[in-house]
Amino acid sequence: MLKKRKKILCIMALAALAVGGCSGEKKETDAVFRVGVPHLMATYDHTKGFDGWSTTRIGVGQTVVRFDAEGKLVPWLADFDGNVFTVKDVKFSDGSKVTAKDICDSLTNSCEKNVRARDVMKQSRWKVLADNKFEYIGEKSILTDPLFCIAKGNLYTGGKVISYDARKAVVERNGRKYEYIAIGDSTTRGMSIETGEVDAVFDVNPLYYKNREHEEVGGARTIMGRLNMRPGRPLSDPKLRKTLAECIDLASMEKALRGYVLCNPNYSRYTKSNRTYKPGKADKPATLELLFYDSRPEFKIIAEATQMQAKAAGIDIKLKNVHVNALRDMELGGDFDIVLSSTTNIQSGTVENYYRLYFDSASPENTTKYSNPAFDNAKSLQEMQDVIDKDYAVIVYGNPLHNRVSKKKLAKLNPLDFYYDVDEVK
């Protein structure tokens, strides 16, 4: 009888362990996955503001096609054969099926609500062919831009937004909750993985790699110092622009930035500036204001190095650290002399579109008011670069690395940071 009782107790104990084990596994699976990101925009509505990146970064917005980690254009919401697209079996977050009409209406809606969307889509056309087919005539890579996430009202095809503000986004995706926490200061962001506050973090100092899963790739970005040439601004003087540009030792600056290199040519085809380091002196003392934001870890280094080297040329640069969400309004207002930007090279689909976005005289995003018919009429990427180099319209610092540090192994890191991939590798 005693043996029988012991046997029953053992079976109960094993059962309890089994239940406890299953419970523990479920708890780990259901746990909130926290991600530290440089910033979130004020809204996840992809049509508002400049880019719509927050929508894709938090795994909510998806586009018709996307670039994969190898730089290849691949289907996402629709397969394509030439100009004809066939919608996959995908649904909005409320469970309703995505149709070709939904996609065409969404593209039209983006263009109606967003100036940049209208500008980059001005040569493109689309129409519904059938319930699950549509025709798109234009540069396909433009469809990767998060401005063209597919949505119906506030419904997207990725995760469901539980709550959102510029500090934190909570998203439910594939039965799990994700919190995307905006941590602007890169050092604080790095410490968040050190202290265990987050499970993964993007774009931090490599010192946080130790004993953790990490991956870094050549980012699909170019760091530029764009120069305000509006009438009455100091840098409307071409001589001052030349002195400023030539006093900066770009080679030594790249070394300080850990030798950042160009990434996969499918993402970025920017060739190095042909400008030489030739420090001189300004004709007269000049004071300039440089805007930057420190959610990019390299910006503070670049800003301070530029300030120091310009001082030797008789140019006093005042640094102004602003929140990234305030930067655009300041640019549009024209109250700056230099603005540091780190923007995806294939924004709006191609590198050529990227250049035209910032330097074409007719572009609404040309906040520096640079104007040269030779650039507007340029036929090739190299020709565009040669013209802006000759005019000293921009200081090109290089291409930053993109990295991710995590507690566990995650899906391959995409150089194009439209996507913050955090899916765990099983």
What are these regions (language model features)?
Residues 19-21:
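C-terminal motif of bacterial Sec signal peptides marking the signal peptidase cleavage site
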Residues 76-115, 192, 234-236:
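Aromatic- and charge-enriched surface segment that lines or borders ligand/interaction sites
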Residues 202-280, 367-372, 391-406:
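Local pocket/hinge segments that shape ligand/substrate recognition
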Residues 281-345:
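Ligand/substrate-recognition segments at binding pockets and active sites
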Residues 318-319, 323-327, 352-411, 426:
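Extracytoplasmic/peripheral linker and loop segments enriched in polar/acidic and small residues
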